[in-house]
Regions:
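Active-site-adjacent loop/helix surface patches within enzyme catalytic domains
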Residues: 1-142
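Short, surface-exposed, charged/polar-biased interaction segments
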Residues: 31, 65-68, 149, 156, ...
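Histidine-centered divalent-metal-coordination microenvironment in nucleic-acid enzymes
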Residues: 72-76, 151, 159-161
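Short, small-residue-rich loop/turn micro-motifs
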Residues: 77-79, 148, 186-188
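Acidic/histidine-rich, metal-coordinating catalytic segments
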Residues: 138-154
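Short, low-complexity, polybasic intrinsically disordered segments
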Residues: 153-177
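SH3-family beta-barrel domains
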Residues: 173-189
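SH3/SH3-like (including bacterial SH3b) beta-barrel domains
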Residues: 192-194
């Protein structure tokens, strides 16, 4: 069916590479899809036309809307997501080890214990900003949200390593980026005394 464009939903793939995620999401076995996958290097792959429903949100709700697939576009960011500490190493669920410099330790907003989270590369964030900005402009999307926001306690993406606040501000506040112009006057009539 056709999407009723209202929201942009940000995800992480929880996979080992963008190519693997693209291949998986393009497979009927996946029973899931997304409009776009963005790689660690900033590469962009479109999987589903932007006017068609993609199966990225699952059981979800937001601001009175149920089943967000019908109302949103989905961007998947190539990212391992939540990592597990084993000694001095960080491991993804699929076995890949991540260097400490590629991981932040943080508590997810719906959890109480810290975990490791793969950081998002600047290239990935830049590409996501470009794609998201174009989609917001073209389809009039009113809000950028995380999968974790529309499916709390079921999903944890894009997670605490994703700079959602600044990402949203850069996208949704673009019209307000122009500096405010203040005019001052020198025609003040200031008196002292009675």
């Amino acid at each position: 069916g056709n999407v009723q464009h209202k929201f942009l939903v940000m995800h992480f793939t929880a996979g080992s590479s963008a190519q693997e995620s693209v291949e998986w999401l393009a497979s009927p076995k996946a029973k899931a899809s997304a409009h776009v996958v963005i790689g660690r290097d900033g590469s962009i792959t479109q999987l589903v036309p932007f006017d068609r429903v993609a199966w990225h949100a699952g059981a979800s709700s937001w601001e009175g809307y149920e089943g967000l697939n019908q109302y949103s576009l989905g961007i998947e960011l190539d990212n391992a997501g939540k990592l597990t500490r084993q000694g001095d190493r960080w491991l993804a669920w699929f076995g890949t080890e991540y260097d400490n410099s590629d991981v932040i330790e943080a508590v997810h907003k719906f959890e109480t214990q810290p975990a490791g989270w793969e950081v998002y590369t600047p290239e990935k964030i830049d590409s996501a900003l470009k794609v998201a900005g174009l989609l917001i402009d073209e389809y009039g999307l009113g809000e950028v949200i995380g999968h974790e926001d529309i499916a709390p306690h079921r999903k944890c993406d894009p997670g605490p390593a994703f700079p959602m606040s600044s990402f949203r501000a850069r996208l949704m506040g673009r019209a307000e980026d122009q500096a405010t112009v203040y005019e001052t006057t020198t025609d003040l009539n200031i008196r002292s005394g009675p």
